[in-house]
Design a protein with these regions (language model features):
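Core structural elements
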Residues: 139-149, 167, 197-199, 248-260, ...
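Intrinsically disordered, low-complexity regulatory segments
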Residues: 1-140, 149, 212, 220-223, ...
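Alpha-helical scaffold elements adjacent to nucleotide-binding pockets in ATP/GTP-utilizing enzyme cores
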Residues: 16-20, 66, 89-97, 117-121, ...
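Conserved short loop/turn motifs at secondary-structure junctions
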Residues: 2, 82-83, 159-163, 245-254, ...
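C-terminal or mid-to-C-terminal helical accessory/interaction module adjacent to the motor/catalytic core
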Residues: 113, 117-195, 246
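Basic, low-complexity terminal or inter-domain segments flanking catalytic cores
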Residues: 2-4, 16, 23-25, 151, ...
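Short acidic, hydrophobic short linear motifs in intrinsically disordered regions
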Residues: 240-243, 251-265, 292-301, 457-469
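Metal- or metallocofactor-binding catalytic centers and their adjacent structured scaffolds
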Residues: 216-254, 441
């Protein structure tokens, strides 16, 4: 009989830990949470100090029964769930569900699933940290109140199956605000000018960029300005004003936090946040390797910290010295650090548990995506302990009368950390002409080249950039980024096309209603402050029920007001002019998961359906037929000709009936402005003036 029972969340984690502890321990899994708030009711006794009413999760009864049998056999129980709020709460629920009050029971935590870390945690066992549990309870209760009270309003005012969330709704607003910025952005024309400079003895010319005159930067806004400048410059003598040679050092990147791992995995590996976290969980809990059995390959994956333990730091530096040479070992004093007030800084950064276990050594034993993620984590960590990269730089200033041009070039002198982390490698721009040129070099103008540009709107959010923005604004924590994005996609509030996230018509409707009825809930500062309060609960500075108590009255007041004042945005069956070709009835407008469509009112006898096209009252500039609002397969709105495919007109911006006064072309709406669709024209006017 095993004298010691260790309870973890997952079978994979149990298998890995069992190997380390031997026969005197039995390691079993709870398969995640065993108790939660009920699904059928709010499960919070508002009149009794917001006491949660936890119940056994459906399907977990058999697991608990088996765990109780194991508890009876054991002399001591160790609760070894994950080292964060959620893990602490699972341990607390297990403690009560298994009635461990009269049993020798301890809480153990480890940042990595290795033999040394697990055995050390048993020596340093402790009681359950109720501050951590209370922080999780506060988050769970707040999220339940928001979801349970607001979601039914969305059901009644828009459609069933929708949801609101404390973090989810703010993230949706952030995406909506960005889409509005993009829609209202008015592109401005500007020009750049460069000069090809001939240097004696060099086959290829230098490309020097116009920077301005002696008084500073000069901006070029039109072709006319450029032509005037070019005519002046053709009559000027080009001379070298100065040549500066130097060095530039590039610091290695910090090791990964949850946020930066999700961002880099999205950019480098094209992985969603959800997939990144799933694979990282596998790497953390244990992977089977030949000769080693099941072993945890990385440290805990939910962290805000870039801190590294002294032991891991020393081991990695030793590995770098042996594999690459001592000159590649980074200076401890030059290692970048980050300061964070967030509570998760108690953890280390995400790193390999053994830096000597290189990706090449285990490539054949891991599935492709698991290997790619491990490789990314390993290279980032090893690079963070390596020396800076050193660049040789040359900067040349050129004078042409009163005007200035500049050339800057660099090449790698010492690779440093880029030997491992090739993502940060910069292409060498040093050519023969740059090496030959001095202040006394006689140079000659070969050609002046002008290029037209247009200012670009802010970029659409990607999963990576949204995670970065949420973190910068203090919205959510490492455990919430991926589930938040997953929920928004699942509810079809947003869609993803070529990595970009776009708001859908449904997402706009939900956000508009949240802004009208619950402005506090979708306020970025309010949500960030709430996260700070939850951190304060974890630190023992604030009672969790006080946080909920202060939040609840205003929330209920907003709900009551919204129920009375918010108008429905869903439309009853609207009869269209479209006639059903199968039965002759006028078709009606219906709402489905992807928005509006036309259906025959004779259903179920007649099941005919058609796409719904909303006319905007503007004629197609190509064929004269109606322009209609359409959607891509993923739900993104655009405007196209009803005569498609015979006519291929389309526009992402809403076309206007007003014609451009400059070129006669069609114009599109950009917020309060009308802008000519022809960028070469660029005519802009106010919408109000054209009414």
């Amino acid at each position: 009989m095993s004298a010691n029972l260790v309870i973890v969340e997952s079978p994979a984690k149990a298998k890995t830990i069992q190997k380390f502890l031997g026969k005197s321990y039995k390691v079993v899994a709870s398969n995640g949470h065993v108790r939660d708030l009920p699904k059928s009711t709010m499960g919070i006794d508002v009149d009794n100090d917001f006491e949660p009413k936890y119940i056994t999760i459906r399907g977990k009864g058999d697991i608990l029964a088996q765990l109780r049998k194991e508890v009876k056999k054991a002399d001591k129980v160790y609760l070894a769930t994950d080292p964060d709020r959620e893990g602490e709460a699972i341990s607390w629920h297990l403690y009560h569900a298994l009635k461990l009050e009269n049993k020798k029971c301890s809480r153990i935590t480890f940042n990595e699933i290795t033999k040394d870390a697990v055995k050390k945690s048993i020596k340093n066992s402790r009681d359950i940290d109720m501050n951590l549990v209370d922080a999780q309870q506060a988050r769970r209760v707040l999220d339940r109140i928001v979801g349970y009270k607001i979601s039914p309003i969305l059901w009644s005012k828009i459609k069933r199956g929708l949801s609101a969330g404390r973090v989810q709704s703010v993230a949706l607003r952030i995406i909506c605000d960005r889409e509005q910025e993009i829609d209202e952005f008015i592109s401005q024309e500007y020009w750049s000018l460069s000069a090809d400079i001939l240097v004696p003895g060099a086959k290829k010319p230098l490309e020097a960029h116009f920077t301005g005159d002696k008084n500073g930067k000069v901006e070029l806004h039109s072709q006319k300005e450029v032509e005037e400048l070019v005519n002046k410059l053709k009559n000027e003598k080009f001379e070298v004003l100065s040549v500066k040679n130097g060095e530039r050092r590039k610091k290695p990147p910090l090791p990964f936090t949850t946020s930066t791992l999700q961002q880099e995995a999205s950019k480098r590996l094209n992985m969603s946040t959800q997939k990144t976290m799933r694979l990282a969980q596998e790497l953390y809990e244990g992977v089977n390797l030949k000769g080693k059995g099941s072993i945890g390959l990385i440290t805990y994956l939910r962290t805000d910290s870039t801190r590294i333990s002294e032991e891991a730091d020393a081991n990695c530096r030793e590995y770098i010295g042996q594999q690459y040479g001592e000159e590649f070992v980074g200076d401890k004093k030059s290692v970048k650090t980050t300061k964070t007030g967030k509570i998760q800084d108690a953890h280390e950064a995400i790193r390999p548990t053994d830096s000597s276990l290189s990706p090449a050594m285990i490539k054949e034993q891991l599935p492709r995506d698991l290997f790619r993620l491990y490789q990314l984590i390993w290279t980032r960590f090893v690079a963070s302990r390596m020396a800076e990269a050193v660049y040789e730089t040359t900067s040349v200033k050129i004078e042409a009368g009163e005007y200035h041009f500049n050339v800057a070039a660099s090449r790698v002198k010492f690779d440093g950390f880029m030997t491992v982390y090739s993502y940060d490698t910069e292409k060498s721009t040093m050519n023969a002409a740059m090496k030959k040129i001095t202040k006394d070099t006689e140079i000659t103008l070969s050609e002046l080249k002008a290029q037209q540009h247009f200012t670009q709107p802010p970029a659409h959010f990607t999963e990576a950039s949204l995670v970065k923005t949420l973190e910068e604004l203090g919205i959510g924590r490492p455990s919430t980024y991926a589930p938040t994005i997953t929920t928004l996609l699942a509810r079809r509030y947003i869609v993803k096309e070529n990595k970009n996230l776009y708001i859908t018509e449904l997402g706009e409707a939900v956000n508009d209603m949240m802004e009208d009825g619950f402005p506090t809930i979708v306020d970025v500062n309010f949500t960030a402050n709430m996260e700070s309060l939850l951190d304060s609960v974890e630190e023992g500075k604030v009672k969790w029920k006080t946080v909920v108590e202060n939040f609840y009255p205003d929330m209920i007041q907003a709900v009551e007001k919204a129920e009375k004042e918010l108008e429905e945005v869903k439309i009853a069956d609207e009869v269209s002019e479209e006639v059903c070709e199968e039965c002759g009835r006028n078709m009606v407008v219906k709402y489905g998961p992807h928005g509006k469509f036309l259906a025959c009112p004779g259903f179920p006898d007649c099941r005919n359906t058609k796409p719904y096209y909303e006319k905007i009252g503007v004629s197609c500039p190509k064929c004269g037929k109606d322009i209609v609002l359409k959607k891509t397969k993923k739900g993104r709105k655009y405007y196209g000709c009803i005569n498609n495919p015979e006519c291929d007109f389309m526009s992402w911006q809403k076309p206007s009936a007003v014609r451009c006064k400059e070129c006669g072309g069609y114009m599109v709406e950009k917020g309060k402005k009308l802008v000519c669709a022809d960028k070469e024209c660029g005519y802009v006017t106010d919408k109000e003036e054209e009414k």
